């Protein structure tokens, strides 16, 4: 979904700037941490935190990719009347929700001792709305500092690419159909990222190894959907795409 109220340069932070957003404390992933994480058993718990835009989300995922638990708070009702995500309102909603979302996620996974049961905390550091990203990063820093577990910075778009390596049954989605449900993408593969901010075709050769084959020269498709829905006075709180294909909807004249 597109943002409202401030310019992209003020709101968005790319992964190249992640050192700036991560520079105010916390136990961050070092080379020793990387080696330790690689040697973890397949059933080791990783806590993931996501606050890049207008959803506050957390999940416990095993090293093998099994989703043990997840919790999410949507902000659709907050942004509906504005026709897009308002960064300041999104940040405030994240601040209100983040503690309860993480607590719910840990409870569902029966985690009672983070320091003993969770091996790392992964958190989105960009791209996204900088003021929203900081809410998630600071929560991750707090957990890391209190329990002595490393932080793994996550690139938002890289995560979208690599979800193709998670088995379909883990997605828990009725809107996605896959021909071979028990297969996952094997390196190398081609990934198409289509969202409100990005349209990119990539060759994925491994984790951290990507080649851009092509990308949009202007607006992303998701942004075009949002703008069109807004012009048609359709609700865009959940995105312009879902708002459109409804034959029962009466369009304004």
Question: Where are the regions that the model predicts?
Answer:
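Catalytic cores of large soluble enzymes that bind and process phosphate-bearing ligands
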Residues: 90-97, 131-135, 150-153, 213-220, ...
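A generic "binding-loop/recognition-motif" signal
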Residues: 54, 157, 197
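N-terminal beta-alpha supersecondary unit
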Residues: 28, 40-117, 123-127, 134
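Glycine-rich phosphate-binding loop and adjoining helix at the ATP-binding site
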Residues: 117-175
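Predominant activation on well-ordered alpha-helical scaffold segments within soluble catalytic domains
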Residues: 95, 99-103, 137-144, 162, ...
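A short helix-loop
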Residues: 2-45, 51-52, 59, 69-70, ...
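Short, acidic/turn-prone active-site loops that include or flank metal/cofactor-
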Residues: 72-76, 156-158, 216-218
């Amino acid at each position: 979904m597109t943002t409202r109220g401030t310019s992209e340069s003020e709101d968005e932070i790319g992964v190249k700037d992640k050192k700036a957003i991560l520079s105010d404390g916390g136990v961050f992933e070092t080379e020793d941490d990387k080696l330790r994480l690689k040697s973890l058993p397949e059933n080791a718990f990783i806590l993931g935190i996501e606050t890049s835009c207008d959803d506050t989300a957390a999940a416990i995922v095993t090293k093998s990719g099994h989703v043990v638990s997840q919790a999410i708070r949507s902000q659709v009702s907050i942004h509906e009347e504005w026709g897009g995500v308002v960064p300041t309102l999104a940040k405030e909603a994240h601040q209100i929700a983040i503690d309860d979302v993480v607590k719910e996620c840990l409870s569902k996974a029966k985690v009672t001792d983070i320091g003993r049961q969770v091996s790392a905390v992964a958190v989105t550091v960009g791209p996204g709305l900088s003021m929203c990203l900081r809410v998630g990063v600071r929560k991750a820093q707090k957990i890391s500092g209190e329990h002595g577990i490393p932080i793994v910075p996550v690139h938002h778009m890289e995560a979208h690419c690599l979800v193709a390596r998670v088995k379909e049954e883990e997605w828990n989605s009725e809107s996605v159909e896959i021909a071979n449900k028990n297969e996952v993408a094997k390196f190398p593969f081609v990934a198409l990222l289509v969202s409100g901010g990005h349209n990119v075709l990539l060759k994925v050769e491994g984790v951290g190894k990507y080649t851009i084959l092509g990308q949009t020269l202007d607006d992303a498709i998701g942004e075009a959907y949002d703008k069109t829905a807004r012009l048609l006075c359709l609700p865009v709180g959940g995105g312009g795409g879902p708002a459109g294909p409804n034959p029962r909807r009466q369009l304004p004249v």
